[in-house]
């Protein structure tokens, strides 16, 4: 039993490692616009983003964590091996796409890997179909919402400031972009850290038969509706530290290769992305921060002129999105089968 308890604790560390990699992989989402507009240096930008990633722990609730913890996969199917297989599926896919410089979704890699491992164990009956509906719908809705809000905000602000001096506008939005970058990092922190919280809660609830005699009471969890404070703080700390580590390959794709940005455009993109993430977090919908900010950046470019968007780069990114859930599910399922054979 002792060995099994330590196995569960090791998986908990793997979950926090995924959260760290999530911050590392998705750092570009939070800082690409503010770096590409030269409002902040890369070093200052990652510190700014990481700080607000952690502050999000004290601002938002845990609706997304509950969706992940009990709303996507039948908890009666979940065990420590399923959770580990799912995490490995997500981590491997994240690292491959990071190496290739593709801003794919860590969020969808996680739920894909988790689902793949559960299906490998119990078949498709492990899937809670109702819980997947809003998640799959928002694969499309989140970037479209980001795109639409950014386009409308860019057009509205351009009209309102049409008689202002360009230099004054640039100076004003350099300051405002610090606020919009902080808001987006808050949204990124709460939406993505909560996904790891949900996985940790699913792990602890499904492992209570093993953990009941563990001396630390904080690890005793029988209700997936309760998210312990230490889980919230650990998840936000891990994603914040990951953001501090950066992710410069993807920054270039996100901030410069989709469309050229000014502080004005960066503000519009980040504000639109933040609003989208806040709405999704309020309703407990796990969305992709990558999809959201990419849609917003594209919306800013399209508002200026359609040719300002490098659609070839955007198309390559879309293909990475389409592949993420099935690819990570396949890796997660294979990881589960391999783990079951050796553990």
Located regions from the model:
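Multi-pass alpha-helical transmembrane bundle typical of ion/small-solute transporters
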Residues: 1-343
């Amino acid at each position: 039993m002792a060995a099994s308890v330590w196995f569960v604790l090791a998986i908990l560390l793997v979950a926090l490692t995924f959260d760290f990699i999530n911050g590392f992989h998705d750092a570009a989402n939070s800082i690409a616009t503010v770096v590409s507009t030269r409002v902040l240096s890369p070093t200052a930008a990652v510190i700014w983003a990481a700080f607000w990633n952690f502050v999000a722990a004290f601002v938002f609730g845990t609706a997304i964590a509950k969706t992940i913890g009990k709303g996507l996969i039948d908890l009666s199917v979940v065990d420590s091996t399923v959770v580990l297989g799912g995490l490995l599926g997500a981590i491997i896919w994240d690292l491959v796409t990071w190496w290739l410089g593709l801003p794919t979704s860590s969020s969808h890699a996680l739920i894909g890997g988790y689902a793949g491992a559960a299906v490998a164990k119990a078949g498709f009956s492990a899937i809670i179909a109702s819980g997947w509906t809003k998640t799959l719908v928002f694969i499309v809705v989140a970037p479209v919402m980001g795109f639409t809000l950014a386009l409308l905000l860019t057009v509205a602000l351009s009209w309102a400031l049409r008689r202002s001096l360009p230099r004054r506008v640039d100076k004003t939005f350099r300051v405002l972009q610090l606020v919009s970058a902080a808001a987006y990092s808050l949204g990124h922190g709460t939406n993505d850290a909560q996904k790891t919280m949900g996985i940790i809660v699913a792990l602890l609830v499904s492992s209570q038969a093993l953990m009941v005699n563990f001396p630390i009471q904080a690890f005793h969890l029988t209700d997936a509706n309760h998210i312990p404070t230490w889980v919230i703080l650990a998840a936000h700390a891990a994603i914040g530290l990951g953001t501090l580590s950066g992710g410069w390959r993807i920054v270039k794709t996100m901030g410069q290769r989709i469309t050229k940005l000014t502080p004005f455009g960066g503000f519009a993109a980040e504000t639109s992305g933040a609003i989208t993430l806040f709405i999704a977090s309020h309703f407990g919908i796990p969305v992709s921060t990558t999809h959201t900010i990419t849609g917003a950046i594209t919306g800013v470019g399209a508002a200026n002129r359609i040719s300002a968007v490098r659609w070839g780069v955007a198309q390559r990114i879309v293909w990475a999105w389409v592949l993420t859930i099935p690819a990570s599910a396949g890796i997660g399922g294979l990881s589960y089968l391999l783990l079951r054979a050796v553990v």
